[in-house]
């Protein structure tokens, strides 16, 4: 318990220093702040209320500006990994790699669709990668329209959003970042190609 609470402050107060801090009187309030700063998520798939991406500090922003000096190399490395994935995964039955009409793509993500012809469903493939300590993401899962704060809206009815729910059940994003070791990229490809 912070000694300043005895001064009759409100429910929370902030401290101003590099990165800042929010001080709360109890674990429940802290937990709510943690949810709010992380898009409302309590775990990988559960959202309890609307939130924001409130995780960037000034130091992170400064590092981001420094990284802009190397953006061409970063994008080239991402594109190289994306090309490798595409080259080796387009022939795997039941895996669909997205294509883009853009002449140049930043390769910020590499989503694939796990289709009916593949021996595993998306969640089983995700679990397989997790067991191998390879971080993949089930992006757009669960759909935002399934969150409690939106699910009662008429526009959130799953019957009216077949593409949303289909994509949410099939998309998995593969790791793609500068410095990703080639052997990990190869393991990702081998894992997908040899799954049964």
Per-region residue spans from a language model:
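Single conserved hydrophobic/aromatic residue that forms the stacking wall/gate
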Residues: 1-13
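PLP-dependent aminotransferase class I/II
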Residues: 25-196
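Glycine-rich phosphate-binding loop of ATP-grasp-fold ATP-dependent ligases
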Residues: 17-22
